């Protein structure tokens, strides 16, 4: 019983959904059963079918009729902020936990090394009081947020940060139609999470799509203004330790330069290489998003499993 995998569905068969599927198939706690899309010719759906998943191009309503029979407990939504709200409502009404990879930000923000554990312990407490509370949805912010907010949090846990600004540069080829439609949501959601989770008093986010050929690797720049003169040693140690934590689930996450100190400004320059699961290694923006979501899903699955074994032992 204890080793049983938790069945999951992937909503969205684009770059992010497909990369996530490939990673989830290697998971020891998650079992990908369904992939849902809206374009029957999408490469993601074809791959999912070839890999033995059940697929539909008729959108989420088709999946909803199979939730109970296939015992789907967690769904990962990699569609678009515009449709996430409706998807979330339908999934939660069936008792499915939702991990949101769009910038819709309905549920609380989740940046694994910063706040995943505290979110899940809150979730457990809430679940006991009132199942289906907001704990049923966790939002993974954005690829730029996953890459940079750990760094801002690493600085702000040492001393107060008045302002945090991030610039995420991604290869145009790695940005599918969903990402492109969500640019405004990307900047808003990331800036908000820089404040809420990163701990900066004010946050700003910029995304740049670089059309260069061959495609460039994901680059992220973080600038923070500290309230007082920065404590060089403490900030450097905190940032390096945070980078190691992120590397545990995103091996291609690297410090290119920094922390660089100039007056009250602290700058950190990062590069994120992907594992090359779906798109080549330049698409580190897919990996940081899907790896963070996978890590969150696996922790959630462990919680669901231990809750199930507790229930079983009460029978």
From Swiss-Prot:
Active site location: 143 (acyl-thioester intermediate)
Membrane-spanning segments: none
Catalysis performed (reactions): acetaldehyde + NAD(+) + CoA = acetyl-CoA + NADH + H(+)
Record GO terms (molecular function): acetaldehyde dehydrogenase (acetylating) activity; NAD binding
Annotated keywords: Aromatic hydrocarbons catabolism, NAD, Oxidoreductase
UniProt GO BP: catabolic process
The name this protein goes by in its record: Acetaldehyde dehydrogenase
Organism in which the protein naturally occurs: Shewanella woodyi (strain ATCC 51908 / MS32)
Lineage: Bacteria, Pseudomonadati, Pseudomonadota, Gammaproteobacteria, Alteromonadales
């Amino acid at each position: 019983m204890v080793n049983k995998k938790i069945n999951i569905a992937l909503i969205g068969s684009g770059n992010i959904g497909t990369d996530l599927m490939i990673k989830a198939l290697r998971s020891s706690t998650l079992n990908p059963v369904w992939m849902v899309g809206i374009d029957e010719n999408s490469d993601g759906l074809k791959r999912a079918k070839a890999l033995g998943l059940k697929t539909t191009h008729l959108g989420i309503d088709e999946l909803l009729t199979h939730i109970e029979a296939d015992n789907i407990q967690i769904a990962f939504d990699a569609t678009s902020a515009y449709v996430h709200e409706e998807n979330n409502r339908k999934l939660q009404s069936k008792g499915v936990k939702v991990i949101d990879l769009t910038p819709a930000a309905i549920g609380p923000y989740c940046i694994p090394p910063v706040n995943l554990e505290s979110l899940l312990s809150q979730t457990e407490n809430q679940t006991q009081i009132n199942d289906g509370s907001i704990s049923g949805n966790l939002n993974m912010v954005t690829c730029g947020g996953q890459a940079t907010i750990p760094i801002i949090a690493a600085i702000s846990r040492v001393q107060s940060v008045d302002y945090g600004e991030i610039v995420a540069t991604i290869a145009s080829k790695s940005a599918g139609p969903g990402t492109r439609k969500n640019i405004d949501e990307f900047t808003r959601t990331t800036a908000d999470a820089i404040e809420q989770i990163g701990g900066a008093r004010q946050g700003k986010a910029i995304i740049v799509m670089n059309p260069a050929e061959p495609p460039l690797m994901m680059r992220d720049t973080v600038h923070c203004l500290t309230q007082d003169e920065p404590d060089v040693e403490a900030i450097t140690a905190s940032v390096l330790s945070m980078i190691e934590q992120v590397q545990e689930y995103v091996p291609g996450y690297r410090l290119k330069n920094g922390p660089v100190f100039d007056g009250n400004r602290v700058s950190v320059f990062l590069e994120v290489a992907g594992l090359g699961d779906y798109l080549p290694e330049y698409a580190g923006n897919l990996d940081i998003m899907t790896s963070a979501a996978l890590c969150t899903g696996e922790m959630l699955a462990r919680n669901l499993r231990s809750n199930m074994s507790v229930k079983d032992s009460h029978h």
